[in-house]
UniProtKB/Swiss-Prot annotation:
Gene Ontology terms describing biological process: cellular response to heat; protein refolding
Stated family: Belongs to the ClpA/ClpB family.
Organism of derivation: Shewanella oneidensis (strain ATCC 700550 / JCM 31522 / CIP 106686 / LMG 19005 / NCIMB 14063 / MR-1)
Lineage: Bacteria, Pseudomonadati, Pseudomonadota, Gammaproteobacteria, Alteromonadales
Name of the protein in its database record: Chaperone protein ClpB
Gene Ontology CC: cytoplasm
């Protein structure tokens, strides 16, 4: 008996049998040990062989365990085990059987055949489990498929389809695939190509997320339901698992062997299998080493002959990048283009999937939620495709509701945490003896009783509501199972079972569900089990930062009072504030053009009058933070080549991978305020880029991605015509001044650029009263900084007027005021604080004496 003539799996099993005997203190390795090792082998061939022969493997395993328990145990042998005479005889018999079959290597299944020829304990166990010599010989022939064992890895290559593919038709029969709604044209076209004589290989091409894999699942479901032409009736759809095919292929040629085994088995099936290769481009170059042949080239002969019915799926970009380069592979496939479904089709798809998601999350998905998911994802999520992005919204919204149902309600959690906090305080105060502590303890105990009572009441309500929801979940699961059983009975033609389910079980469950739902309909105070359009809007708002959720009363009031909020920081400039506020209100009320930015403005006026300040104020109003302001200083874009920094460098240039300054900022924050400061200083070519943004609300970056600007406010500032504003201030009306300024502007900017801007706003120069108002705002900011150091600041009206008077300059606006404040107030204050003249805790009074500021405490 030569071990080197055994297959790798058989050699491994003998090593495992030795370990088993050693662990149980047996002196000899018996046939029982080897049989147990073969049964326990990972991805071994004996377990599936016996199962295929109809032998009860679990019964055989328990019989083997009983026999192994009876074997004598020998201690103190020092780990010395050897093959028993019975096992040597069986292995020699295996060698004889292999020679008889003209095999070069002895495979594991011959051991079972050899064992059945004997009459020892192993033969008895096999016979009790239902194995006979004739049955095993038949099964071995089926498994081998007429092939000889010419390779030590021959056992690994058997049952290749079972190991390296997933049976989609089997999954469809079990009801594990999601229903496929619509897509009839694409499925029909796929079937049409599959029925060709040669090159009967469709490849589904479309953007990621449009449902290419779903079309193949739909085909599998139609085959199972018999809704296909005679040519492909009763065929199986197998999905190739590329991961399993490549995983563990350590040595050169192992991957090719596995793929060849798959192709050989497919050839034996004689056209009864349709192979589905998802991500088809992975086949090109897969397994390619130095001079090795890749998977794509191995498939070509089978594809061209028509031996292999193959359906591929890949994206447009990857098809161009990998498949089109290999013309010989491309011509063997027939393209089937899969377009993105419309919003109406997406709604139909979501309605079909609704029950599956309800069953998974144990929540109810309302129809308004489905409509909202399709319409909102189409409008606000621009970088992905329907129906995938709409399904994601439904899934995540249902998940959030489910999470709230499973976890403690926030209000109850808050009360319980407060109770713990109060108990800790109570323990600390109980150790104190003074009067104040005792009074505090009494108040605290009263509050604790109140909090515990509320928490107990809420906890009871929560438990009741949770129990009510659990009832409907069980009924829904039973109803889904009954419907699956009905489908199985219909396919099997079992009319008795069909009538029992259709007219008995299903109507009864539907009635129970209706009653349970009515009980649930009563107003729930803590739990929600319905996904509505509000939840969809919340999920979308969190993901994109775009406020699409329903406006609360407070937000409506805030929007109506928007001018007041903006005027807190922007003094004067009523026309500019009104224009911006109206644009934001139009957008939030849903009246703005969905294909353009929320608003685009050109702010014109002299320096220091509040053009940039209004943008900062708007960003703070919308996002509670000035960091949401995307500020681009256009003076940096004075050269022609600098334009590429906005949208990203073109291919072949340094920095191509990094993306553009403007496009990347908007991709990350689709809802933002974009400030293009000092726009007249930029190169004229910059405005060519802005034309597309202002008109269609989109821009293509250097990598060909479309960036959505439809949820941005675009503000450009310029100093053009500031001399006219200065001269005309006081004696020209606003409309006269605006027309004079626009006359200057038209000479600098092209008409097609100006024509696309929503509104050009002219800012007035600031008068003395405005400057005084701004001075009070800046002193409030200084007061806040001093408060951090425990100083309070009080300033008289005369001192404020003096600072405003010093800082007033009609040409330079409010900027000289800042310098005046630094020189007249901040510098002397800093010196006094450092000298220790002013003490913390006491108010600092600033007054005006003889035209100078005086600081005293």
């Amino acid at each position: 008996m030569r071990l080197d003539r055994m297959t790798n799996k058989f050699q491994l099993a003998i090593s495992d049998a030795q370990s088993l005997a050693l662990g149980r203190d047996h002196q000899f390795i018996e046939p029982l040990h080897l049989m147990m090792a073969l049964l326990n082998q990972d991805s071994g061939s004996i377990h599936p062989l016996l199962t295929q022969a109809g032998i009860r493997v679990s019964a055989l395993r328990s019989l083997l365990s009983q026999e192994l328990e009876r074997l004598p145990q020998v201690e103190g042998t020092g780990g010395d085990v050897q093959l028993s005479q019975g096992l040597i005889r069986l292995l020699n018999l295996c060698d004889k059987l292999a020679q008889k079959r003209k095999d070069k290597y002895i495979s594991s299944e011959l051991f079972v055949l050899a064992a059945l020829e004997g009459c020892d304990a192993l033969a008895q166990c096999l016979k009790k489990s239902g194995a006979t010599k004739e049955l095993m010989e038949q099964t071995i022939e089926q498994v081998r498929g007429g092939q000889k064992v010419d390779d030590p890895n021959a056992e690994d290559q058997r049952q290749a389809l079972k190991k390296f593919t997933v049976d989609l038709t089997e999954r469809a029969e079990q009801g594990k695939l999601d229903p496929v709604i619509g897509r009839d044209d694409e499925i029909r076209r796929t079937i049409q190509v599959l029925q060709r004589r040669t090159k009967n290989n469709p490849v589904l091409i479309g953007e990621p997320g449009v449902g290419k894999t779903a079309i193949v699942e739909g085909l599998a479901q139609r085959i199972v339901n018999g809704e296909v032409p005679e040519g492909i009736k009763n065929k199986r759809v197998l999905s190739l698992d590329m991961g399993a095919l490549i995983a563990g292929a350590k040595y050169r040629g192992e991957f090719e062997e596995r793929l060849k085994a798959v192709l050989n088995e497919l050839a034996q099936e004689e056209g009864q299998v349709i192979l589905f290769i998802d991500e088809l481009h992975t086949m090109v170059g897969a397994g390619k080493g130095d001079g090795a042949m890749d998977a794509g080239n191995m498939l070509k002969p089978a594809l061209a002959r028509g031996d292999l019915h193959c359906v591929g799926a890949t994206t447009l970009d990857e098809y161009r990048q990998y498949i089109e380069k290999d013309a010989a592979l491309e011509r063997r496939f027939q393209k089937v283009l899969v377009d993105e479904p419309s919003v109406e089709d997406t709604i139909a798809i979501l309605r079909g999937l609704k029950e599956r998601y309800e069953l998974h999350h144990h929540v109810e998905i309302t129809d308004p939620a489905i409509v909202a998911a399709a319409t909102m994802s189409h409008r606000y999520v621009s970088d992905r495709k329907l129906p995938d992005k709409a399904i994601d919204l439904i899934d995540e919204a249902a998940s959030s509701i489910r999470m709230q149902m499973d976890s403690k309600p926030e209000s109850l959690d808050r009360l319980e945490r407060r109770a713990i906090q109060l108990k800790l305080e109570e323990q600390a105060l109980a150790k104190e003896n003074d009067e104040a502590s005792r009074r505090r303890l009494d108040h605290l105990q009263e509050e604790l009783r109140d909090v515990e009572a509320k928490a107990s009441e809420l906890s009871e309500i929560w438990r009741t509501e949770k129990a009510a929801l659990a009832g409907t979940q069980h009924i829904k699961a039973d109803l889904e199972q009954a419907r699956l059983d009905l489908e199985v009975a219909r396919r099997a033609g079992d009319l008795t079972r069909m009538s029992e389910l259709q007219y008995g079980r299903i109507p009864e469950l539907e009635k129970q569900l209706d009653l349970a739902s009515q009980a649930e309909m009563q107003d729930m105070t803590l739990l929600r089990n319905k996904v509505t359009d509000l939840e969809i809007a919340e999920v979308l708002s969190k993901a994109t930062g775009i406020p699409v959720s329903k406006m609360l009363e407070g937000e409506r009031e805030k929007l109506l009072q928007m001018e007041v909020a903006l005027h807190e920081r922007v003094i004067g400039q009523n026309e500019a504030v009104d224009a911006v506020a109206n644009a934001i209100r139009r957008s939030r009320a849903g009246l703005a053009d969905p294909n353009r930015p929320i608003g685009s403005f050109l702010f014109l006026g002299p320096t220091g009058v509040g053009k940039t300040e209004l943008c900062k104020s708007l960003a703070r109003f919308l996002f509670d933070s000035e960091s949401a302001l995307v500020r681009i200083d256009m003076s940096e874009f004075m050269e022609k080549h600098a334009v590429s920094r906005l949208v990203g460098a073109p291919p072949g240039y340094v920095g191509y991978e990094e993306g553009g300054y403007l496009t990347e900022a908007v991709r990350r924050k689709p809802y933002s305020v974009i400030l293009l400061d000092e726009v007249e200083k930029a190169h004229p070519d910059v405005f060519n880029i802005l034309l597309q943004v202002l008109d269609d609300g989109r821009l293509t970056d250097g990598q060909g991605r479309t960036v959505d600007f439809r949820n941005t406010v675009i503000i450009m500032t310029s100093n053009l015509g500031s001399d006219i504003i200065q001269e005309g201030f006081g004696h020209l009306s606003y409309s006269e001044m605006k027309s004079a300024v626009m006359n200057v502007v038209t000479h600098s900017f092209r008409p097609e650029f100006l024509n696309r801007i929503d509104e050009s706003v002219v800012f007035h120069p600031l008068d003395a009263e405005n400057i005084k108002h701004i001075a009070s705002i800046q002193i409030a900011s200084l007061r806040k900084r001093l408060a951090e150091k425990d100083y309070t600041l009080e300033i008289t009206d005369e001192a404020l007027s003096l600072i405003a008077e010093i800082g007033f300059d009609p040409v330079y606006g409010a900027r000289p005021l800042k310098r005046a404040l630094q020189q007249e107030m901040e510098n002397p204050l800093a010196q006094k604080l450092l000298r220790g003249d002013l003490l913390p805790g006491k108010p600092i009074k600033v007054s005006c004496v003889d035209g100078e500021l005086v600081f005293e405490q």
